[in-house]
Amino acid sequence: MATWAQFGLQDASSPLMEELTYFHDYALIVLTLITILVFYGLVSLLLSSSTNRFFLEGQELETIWTVVPAFILIFIALPSLQLLYLMDEVNNPFLTIKAIGHQWYWSYEYTDYNDLEFDSYMVPTSDVSLGNPRLLEVDNRLILPMQNPIRVLVSSADVLHSWAVPSLGVKMDAVPGRLNQTTFFAARAGLFYGQCSEICGANHSFMPILIESVPFSNFENWVAQYIEE
């Protein structure tokens, strides 16, 4: 979960988010070096008082400043493309969840079980219990088994929404009339907070996502208890 005055990314709780964090750091280092090099060149040019009136062309120099940036772009693009294909890969999901966006709440369906669906609304600030974050607590948490691949089918009942949980590296647009899919793998037990990440109206900021990752035995007990009720 994001904390006050946090400048970095949230702690990774899935293999995909770990890779995204690594790529972020890798790209940041490359861009920092490029910025320093360009800044050094500009300062050197401005402070230099010497000129060469007979320098009309430089084939070697033009080749260097064409080839070097091309190689830099390749080194940035390769890990980016690898992550892009990794995010779209769906291999034998253990459980499939359907998340539907509404103005302004989420509804969830466990497609592998009969009659296991519910709506998830934000808990008003006045009703939030001590220790729980405001604007992120919900009345019905999305309970999922840890250390199992989960597929999420995302859609919308009205306008554009976006189902996003940063610590799991998940973000998928909810488009009316269309079913998008994404997968994630919660590596540990805990609470993972997210929010709608597409402006969807007046209460866009008040439709949080709360995933509770639990051991599989606890998940089975919760499913049995929910179906009985």
Swiss-Prot record:
Q: Cite the EC number.
A: 7.1.1.9
Q: What is its main location?
A: mitochondrion
From the UniProt record, list the reaction(s) this protein catalyses: 4 Fe(II)-[cytochrome c] + O2 + 8 H(+)(in) = 4 Fe(III)-[cytochrome c] + 2 H2O + 4 H(+)(out)
Ligand binding (Mg(2+)): E198
Any one cellular-component term (Gene Ontology): mitochondrial inner membrane
Looking up PROSITE patterns in the UniProt record yields:
COX2 (PS00078), COX2_CUA (PS50857), COX2_TM (PS50999)
Q: Keyword Lyase on this protein?
A: no
The record's subcellular locations are: Mitochondrion inner membrane
Q: How does it sit in the membrane?
A: Multi-pass membrane protein
Q: Say yes or no: keyword Translocase present.
A: yes
Question: Cofactor binding mode, per the note?
Answer: Binds a dinuclear copper A center per subunit.
Needs which cofactor?
A: Cu cation
Q: Indicate which residues the UniProt annotation says bind Cu cation A1.
A: H161, C196, C200, M207
In this UniProt entry, which residues form the Mitochondrial matrix topological domain(s)? 49-62
Q: Where does Cu cation A2 bind?
A: C196, E198, C200, H204
Subunit structure of this chain's protein: Component of the cytochrome c oxidase (complex IV, CIV), a multisubunit enzyme composed of a catalytic core of 3 subunits and several supernumerary subunits. The complex exists as a monomer or a dimer and forms supercomplexes (SCs) in the inner mitochondrial membrane with ubiquinol-cytochrome c oxidoreductase (cytochrome b-c1 complex, complex III, CIII).
Q: What is this protein called?
A: Cytochrome c oxidase subunit 2
Q: Which organism is it from?
A: Paracentrotus lividus
